[in-house]
Swiss-Prot record:
Pfam families reported in the protein's UniProt record: Epimerase
Gene Ontology molecular function: L-threonine 3-dehydrogenase activity
Similarity annotation: Belongs to the NAD(P)-dependent epimerase/dehydratase family.
PANTHER family, per database record: L-THREONINE 3-DEHYDROGENASE, L-THREONINE 3-DEHYDROGENASE, MITOCHONDRIAL
InterPro entries in the record: Epimerase_deHydtase, NAD(P)-bd_dom_sf, NAD(P)_epim/dehydratase
Name of protein: Uncharacterized epimerase/dehydratase SH2450
Single GO biological process annotation from the record: threonine catabolic process
Gene3D superfamilies given in the database record: NAD(P)-binding Rossmann-like Domain (3.40.50.720)
Domain of life of the native organism: Bacteria
Native source organism of the sequence: Staphylococcus haemolyticus (strain JCSC1435)
Length: 318
């Protein structure tokens, strides 16, 4: 990878992916794009930026051609809870954008990455140690998009030889950008509210286990997969990824080691709870570890300490 275009660069993953790629490959070699201009204080302002609507294929191709890109990381998407509220928009953006990105990758012979998700699984999937290859019958529009996306990426690799690669992300936890529209977002919000208010009301019920990962591990995984030898990638599209699995009470216990008075109560959102209930409790990541060396660094305790310290600094500097 030498010249990288990233769509959805102002999103939760995109923002940090842009920064890490610029750190490794150089600021001027990573072009950030999104549907809107960044705020003045956005961290992505440290390098080139273009406004891009991913549903406009001609505009996407023009940006890739003008930048002389060799890699396209397609991160633009409507997330799970938001997609469920507006399924037609989700299909148009998530699938239309992906098709345009894949066609762009085919036309310009690009290395290609796009994220899938644990949302690609459903009620009929084994919930414990969910295998890499298993039943995928999601009950949400977001999940349907992700399953279709995995199949499309594999199709473009098999049919056209496009170097497609993707991972099934769990919930991703970060202090850099506050989340929006995801089912696992409670696991980010809880840290911000612990620092700001000393309490949190969870929309996800007690004893609801979901796979999670600290954002630094997620970004490192993308780059490690993209730098891996293509010949060693057997699975290629939709690698299971996770660093930990927990439920709300376990985060509370870790936060209370730093904030003993922290209080947690519940006001369950039936839409997001139903989505969470359809997902695995924990997934098998052995294929990712074996084929390209996935090895996350952070567990719940380490992540909690980092999150609280970082948010405390943010709040003090406001």
């Amino acid at each position: 990878m030498e010249r990288i275009v990233i769509t959805g660069a102002l999103g939760q993953i995109g923002t940090e992916l842009v920064l890490k790629c610029r750190e490794i490959y150089g600021n001027d070699n990573v072009l950030a794009t999104d549907i809107r201009e960044p705020e003045e204080d956005s961290p992505v302002n440290n390098g080139p930026f273009e406004v891009l609507d991913v549903t406009n294929r001609e505009a996407m191709m023009a940006i890739v051609e003008n930048f002389k890109a060799d890699t396209l990381m397609h991160m633009a998407a409507l997330l799970s809870a938001t997609a469920e509220k507006n399924p037609l928009l989700a299909w148009d953006l998530n699938m239309g954008g992906l098709m345009n990105a894949l066609e762009t990758a085919r036309t310009y012979e690009l290395h290609f990455f796009t994220p899938s998700s644990i949302g690609a699984f459903g009620d009929s999937t084994p919930k414990k140690d969910t295998p890499q290859n298993t039943i995928q019958q999601p009950t949400t529009m977001y999940g349907v998009n992700k399953v279709a996306g995995e199949l499309l990426c594999q199709y473009y690799f098999t049919k056209f030889g496009v170097d497609t690669r993707s991972v099934r992300f769990p919930g991703l936890i970060s202090h850099v950008k506050e989340p929006g529209g995801g089912t696992t977002d409670y696991a980010v919000e809880i840290y911000f509210e612990a620092v700001r208010k000393g309490r949190y009301t969870s929309y996800i019920a007690k004893d609801t286990y979901m796979d999670m990962m600290y954002m630094d591990d997620a970004i490192d995984a993308i780059i490690k997969l993209m730098e891996a030898d293509s010949d060693k990638l057997v699975t290629r599209n939709g690698y299971n990824l996770s660093a930990m699995s927990f439920e709300p009470e376990q985060i509370k216990a870790e936060i209370q080691k730093h904030y003993p008075g922290f209080a947690l109560d519940y006001e369950v959102d039936p839409v997001r709870q139903a989505i969470a209930d359809s997902w695995p409790d924990n997934i098998d990541t052995s294929y990712s570890r074996k084929e390209w060396g996935f090895n996350p660094k952070y567990d719940l305790a380490g992540m909690t300490e980092l999150m609280l310290k970082a948010i405390e600094e943010k709040e003090q500097n406001k």
